[in-house]
Amino acid sequence: MKNKIKIFRKLVRCASIALLSFSMAGCGADFLDTTPTNNISGSSIWTKATLAEQAVIGVYNVFLDQYCPNSGILDSHRIPWDAYSSVMDTDKNWIKRMPNCTGAATPSSGLFSDIYKRFYTFIYRANDVIDNIGQVPDMSTGEKQRAIAECKFLRAFAYMRLNILYKGVPLYMNAITSPENGNKARSSEADVWAAILQDLTDCVNEPNLPGKYNSGDSNYGRVTKGAAYALRGQVYMWQKNWEAAVDDFNSVADCGFGLYTKAGATSYKQLLKIANEQCEEMIFSVQCIKQYGYSNTRNITYGNRCTAGSMWNNYLPNPHFVESFETATGEKFNWDNYLPGYSTMKEKE
């Protein structure tokens, strides 16, 4: 009887080992089909031109949340870029909620972490396209080169904003394929400017990137050489390279862009109307979305209770910013012409 029990135990033990071995062999890397059925996997995007084009559009899509928010006015990632400069203030009742306007924001503030995340989303997506779109079998070389140029512009746009704020950030110029290459140290401000200029120079030298899209073109709103010249000119201004900036801005005009003057004396006002959002003065603009609940960020923060639901105009143009404009006759702006005694008023007044 004891011998039978021992034999039985050995059989059970052997069967368990065999079952475990079978389980381990059956759980190999190719045992489960991990390809999602409800969306496109990353490995499939570069197999068709239609999918690759959606990846390019996905880079542009980062603009949607930045410029066309559909909820909230205090979310830090929806605060206009103006808030991080000297051109905007906020009213006294909300000053504690707007540390970005008072210089009281800290490095740990969500105001900055949200911007950091958004622009690195730009960079991550752009790098993915730049590194991989060359694999697409049914896309022409010209289409691939144009897409790469567009994504280099968008990458440069993101790095420019980051470099203005942080004066040096980690520089990623290739897609992140593993955790090991996703933990770079901070690059110097000069190195980031150099990378930005190289991207924009590649754009203006790309023969497959058009100088300008005309109004009504199905590609209107996409990156052009004119936009690349304009952005590179801004970079040169940040570097105080004035002559290079002037040359680039002249090149913008050479691409077919120019001031909107068709409305005569009211041209500047009419420029900001929907009817003229594709006029010759618009170099690179986010188009209006005619969809309920969406609104331009400035409509929300500078508007009234009628814009985007029930929004408030707690952001106010800084008086010094207003003073930087000339009058219609070319004279220097003077508050006393509009508010007599303004220049002699005390701060509390």
Stretches found by the model and what they are:
Residues N163-I164, P170, W238-N241:
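Short coil/turn linking the two alpha-helices of tandem helical-hairpin repeats
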Residues T37-S41, A104-A105, M173-N181, N214-D217:
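Short linear capping/connector segments at secondary-structure termini
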Residues K4, M24-G26, P137-K152, Q239-S251:
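Secondary-structure transition into beta-strands, especially the periplasmic turns and strand N-termini
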Residues G168-A175, N205-D217, L259-T266:
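Glycine- and aromatic-rich loop/turn segments at beta-sheet edges
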Residues K48-C68, D89-Y166, N181-N183, S187-A194, ...:
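Conserved, well-structured interaction surfaces
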Residues G28-K92, W193, T201, P207, ...:
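An aromatic- and glycine-enriched ligand-binding surface/loop that stacks and positions planar moieties
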Residues K2-A25:
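Sec-dependent bacterial lipoprotein signal peptides
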Residues G26-T35, I95-P99, V169-P170:
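Short, compositionally biased low-complexity segments
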